[in-house]
């Protein structure tokens, strides 16, 4: 029964599915002689969503982009770093080809190609990893190696990395096993000295040891939701051998280690090949010559380096590259701020000399591409503060003098009279 007599002439309506009265639910929707409540509608939605997810076709190998297509996609978002893009494109293509065709490898077990990115701050390491995950439509998570400690110590366990990945895909284990994990600041967990210490290094070599199995491939037991607060819950079993791990770091000081190895054996005394300060290799040139022995000397243990067979080095960005980054990528900084101003109905123009000045300032700060946003944000702060309160502004122009702090941005008004009043 969907209705019952409450009193004379009054009808109390009930949900035809769960039997709850109209007073027990938020909304009761009427149909031809039937009613359904909002709770039952929500339950039906959940059931349909679950069924669609189960029957949705899996991506097959034919959808995997080729290395050329991967590289082309990276070009849309990342300026420069041609060698790193090529290395990443091949490594990622081989990794996912291995996953999709593991049964057809003719009994040959294909090895895992985890990646180590070495490059200065702001050179695009994180952006490359994020762009890859977006292209491949796979779960992606970032972890900071500096927060990791061995199990049992204050800090994050390495298993938390997999838990973060699961959270990104609503704890769908199958989906998580095809994901990408980017571990940043990997150079910060290098061994504190060349000689093993008696005291325990829980945030350096200890973390490297803990990451070994995870990166190589193991069955990680991860609590579903709530972690250790709900020990009665069954743990999820995640096979990390299918997850692509990309580790990145600035490796400050590694160039000196490489240089020491390169000049070793050049002799001493009158016959020595002494290089002048100007003749020394640049940071990018040194990074390009990196060998596993250099990383071991830097503080990474040999077993850990062995788990990261693909090494891609990124070059320092020069002023010309920073100018390109400001205006060329699909999500370029100038395009982002132009879109932001467009929401106010105002056109934003950056003149070429302004872009040169921004890039020059970022080079002086030695922050790479990462420092560009803070410079632009500081320059536009007052304008973004005042603009919503001003009427009739049609365009804002930024030139070199604005970046240097010698003048305010030029505001152009729709009405010439308003422009004249402001000038006065």
Curated annotation (Swiss-Prot):
Binding-site positions, ATP: 120-127
Domain of life: Bacteria
Start and end residues of each ClpX-type ZB domain: 3-56
Gene3D superfamilies recorded: 1.10.8.60, ClpX chaperone, C4-type zinc finger domain, P-loop containing nucleotide triphosphate hydrolases
Binding site for Zn(2+): 15, 18, 37, 40
Signal keyword on record: no
SUPFAM superfamilies xrefs: Glucocorticoid receptor-like (DNA-binding domain), P-loop containing nucleoside triphosphate hydrolases
GO MF, any single term: ATP-dependent protein folding chaperone
SMART domains in the cross-refs: AAA, ClpB_D2-small, zf-C4_ClpX
Keywords for this protein: ATP-binding, Chaperone, Metal-binding, Nucleotide-binding, Zinc
GO BP: cell division; proteolysis involved in protein catabolic process
InterPro entries noted in UniProt: AAA+_ATPase (IPR003593), ATP-dep_Clp_protease_ClpX (IPR050052), ATPase_AAA_core (IPR003959), Clp_ATPase_C (IPR019489), Clp_protease_ATP-bd_su_ClpX (IPR004487), ClpX_bact (IPR046425), P-loop_NTPase (IPR027417), Znf_CppX_C4 (IPR010603)
A single Gene Ontology CC term: HslUV protease complex
Pfam families: AAA_2, ClpB_D2-small, zf-C4_ClpX
Keyword Ubl conjugation recorded: no
HAMAP family reported for this sequence: ClpX (MF_00175)
Family according to the record: Belongs to the ClpX chaperone family.
Role summary: ATP-dependent specificity component of the Clp protease. It directs the protease to specific substrates. Can perform chaperone functions in the absence of ClpP.
Subunit comment: Component of the ClpX-ClpP complex. Forms a hexameric ring that, in the presence of ATP, binds to fourteen ClpP subunits assembled into a disk-like structure with a central cavity, resembling the structure of eukaryotic proteasomes.
Protein name: ATP-dependent Clp protease ATP-binding subunit ClpX
Gene name as annotated: clpX
């Amino acid at each position: 029964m969907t209705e019952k007599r409450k009193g004379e002439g009054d009808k109390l309506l009930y949900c035809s599915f769960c039997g709850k009265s109209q007073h027990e639910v938020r909304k009761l929707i009427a149909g031809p002689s039937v009613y359904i409540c909002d709770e039952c509608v929500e339950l039906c939605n959940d059931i349909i969503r679950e069924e669609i997810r189960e029957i949705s076709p899996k991506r097959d190998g034919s959808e995997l982009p080729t290395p050329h297509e991967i590289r082309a996609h990276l070009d849309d978002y990342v300026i420069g770093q041609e060698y790193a893009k090529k290395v990443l494109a091949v490594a990622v293509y081989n990794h996912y080809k291995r996953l999709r065709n593991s049964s057809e490898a003719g009994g040959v077990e294909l090895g895992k190609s985890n990646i180590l990115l070495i490059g200065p701050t702001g050179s695009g390491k994180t952006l490359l990893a994020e762009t890859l995950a977006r292209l491949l439509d796979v779960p992606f998570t970032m972890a900071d190696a500096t927060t990791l400690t061995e199990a049992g110590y204050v800090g994050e366990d390495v298993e938390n990395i997999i838990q973060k990945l699961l959270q990104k895909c609503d704890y769908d284990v199958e989906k998580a096993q095809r994901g990408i994990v980017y571990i940043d600041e990997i150079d910060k967990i290098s061994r504190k000295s060349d000689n093993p210490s008696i005291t325990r290094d829980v945030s350096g070599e200890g973390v490297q040891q803990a990451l070994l199995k995870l990166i190589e491939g193991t069955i990680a037991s991860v609590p579903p939701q709530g972690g250790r607060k709900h020990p009665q819950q069954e743990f999820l079993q995640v096979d990390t051998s299918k997850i692509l791990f990309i580790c990145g770091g600035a490796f400050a000081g590694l160039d000196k280690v490489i240089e020491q190895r390169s000049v070793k054996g050049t002799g001493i005394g009158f016959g020595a090949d002494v290089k002048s300060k100007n003749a020394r290799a640049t940071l990018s040139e040194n990074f390009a010559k990196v060998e596993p022995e250099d990383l071991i000397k830097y503080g990474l243990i040999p077993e850990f380096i062995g788990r990261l067979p693909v090494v891609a080095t990124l070059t320092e960005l020069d002023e010309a590259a920073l100018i390109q980054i400001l205006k060329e990528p699909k999500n370029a900084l100038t395009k982002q701020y132009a879109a932001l101003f467009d929401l106010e109905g105002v056109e934003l123009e950056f003149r070429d000399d302004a872009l040169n000045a921004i890039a020059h300032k970022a080079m002086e700060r030695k922050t790479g591409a990462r420092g560009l946003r803070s410079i632009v944000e500081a320059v536009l702060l007052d304008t973004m503060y005042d603009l919503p309160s001003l009427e009739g502004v049609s365009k804002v122009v930024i030139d070199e003098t604005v970046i240097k702090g010698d003048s305010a941005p030029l505001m152009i008004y729709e009405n010439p009279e308003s422009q004249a009043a402001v000038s006065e």
